[in-house]
């Protein structure tokens, strides 16, 4: 079912590594689930929905195997149809022109849930949001949570035309590892503070309210450097649907490793 993810998630470096790992875990789970019913399903079906009888199986076992294969084929067809629909919907949205003098908001999210026996449930959640305002102003927010690996991460980016300052934070609840990284696009790290002030100034022109772009605050990360202060300013007070699961996420802690990198765009 995880194949239902749109290409916007699969092709995004922020999500891709976690998606591939989760997909492999799902495949292993499905293989272990089908073994008690039909062992190797590929050896049972001829690929056209017909099931061959095998020696050593009685009629009851063959009937169960046929039912299992038919059910899986039905589910696979449903998933395939849904994925085609989502891809078509995504193409239609991509064709919509964005008015540079207007405001826009776009949001996508996905969630998978699985549970076998007495094992804890495995939940994978991912979401992405983009807000735009006149003057090339944009805010991007991405979040991901994988209960199986224990990884939770979030990225918030502020953009003015081709310049951007992106802050990424992550925490692995199983290992305790925490990290905050900063990415500077078409700018140097020394320009970050001036850029953030410019971004806030541009946003304030549009009489910000509760749900506007600059309504963000970050919890303290234990270091009063420019990156940490900007994290505080950017955090959203509401719970993030991809990180939160009935409570406020504790992605940030008291001791984090801060890293920064500059990226030059090839756009002219």
Curated annotation (Swiss-Prot):
MF terms in GO: DNA binding
Residues with the Phosphoserine modification: 6, 8, 32
Oligomeric form and interacting partners: Interacts with CENPU. Also interacts with NRBP1/MADM, YWHAZ/14-3-3-zeta and HNRPUL2/MANP. NRBP1 recruits a serine kinase which phosphorylates both itself and MLF1. Phosphorylated MLF1 then binds to YWHAZ and is retained in the cytoplasm. Retained in the nucleus by binding to HNRPUL2. Binds to COPS3/CSN3 which is required for suppression of COP1 and activation of p53.
Bias-annotated ranges (Basic and acidic residues): 226-237, 244-257
Post-translational modification, as annotated: Phosphorylation is required for binding to YWHAZ.
Purpose of the protein: Involved in lineage commitment of primary hemopoietic progenitors by restricting erythroid formation and enhancing myeloid formation. Interferes with erythropoietin-induced erythroid terminal differentiation by preventing cells from exiting the cell cycle through suppression of CDKN1B/p27Kip1 levels. Suppresses COP1 activity via CSN3 which activates p53 and induces cell cycle arrest. Binds DNA and affects the expression of a number of genes so may function as a transcription factor in the nucleus.
Higher taxonomy: Eukaryota, Metazoa, Chordata, Craniata, Vertebrata
Protein name as annotated: Myeloid leukemia factor 1
GO CC terms of this entry: ciliary basal body; cilium; cytoplasm; nucleus
Species in which this protein is naturally found: Pongo abelii
Main location: cytoplasm
């Amino acid at each position: 079912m995880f194949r239902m993810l749109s290409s916007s998630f699969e092709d995004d470096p922020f999500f891709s590594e976690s998606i591939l790992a989760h997909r492999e875990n799902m495949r292993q789970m499905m293989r272990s689930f089908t073994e008690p019913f039909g062992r190797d399903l590929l050896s049972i079906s001829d690929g056209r929905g017909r099931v061959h009888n095998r020696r050593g199986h009685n009629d009851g076992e063959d009937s169960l195997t046929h039912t299992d294969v038919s059910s899986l084929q039905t589910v696979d067809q449903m998933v395939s149809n849904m994925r085609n629909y989502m891809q078509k919907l995504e193409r239609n949205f991509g064709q919509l022109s964005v008015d540079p003098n207007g405001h826009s908001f776009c949001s996508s999210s996905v969630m998978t849930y699985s549970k076998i026996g007495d094992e804890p449930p495995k939940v994978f959640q991912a979401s992405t949001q983009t807000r735009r305002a006149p003057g090339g102003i944009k805010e991007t927010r991405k979040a991901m949570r994988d209960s199986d690996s224990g990884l939770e991460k979030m990225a918030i980016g502020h953009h003015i035309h081709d310049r951007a300052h992106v802050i990424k934070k992550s925490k692995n609840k199983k290992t305790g590892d925490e990290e905050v990284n900063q990415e500077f696009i078409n700018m140097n790290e020394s320009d970050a503070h001036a850029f953030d002030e410019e971004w806030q100034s541009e946003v304030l022109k549009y009489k910000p309210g509760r749900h506007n772009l600059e309504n963000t605050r970050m919890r303290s990360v234990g270091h009063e450097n420019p990156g940490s202060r900007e994290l505080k300013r950017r955090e959203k007070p509401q719970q993030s649907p991809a990180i939160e699961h009935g409570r406020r996420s504790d992605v940030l802690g008291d001791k984090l490793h801060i890293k920064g990198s500059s990226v030059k765009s090839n756009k002219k």
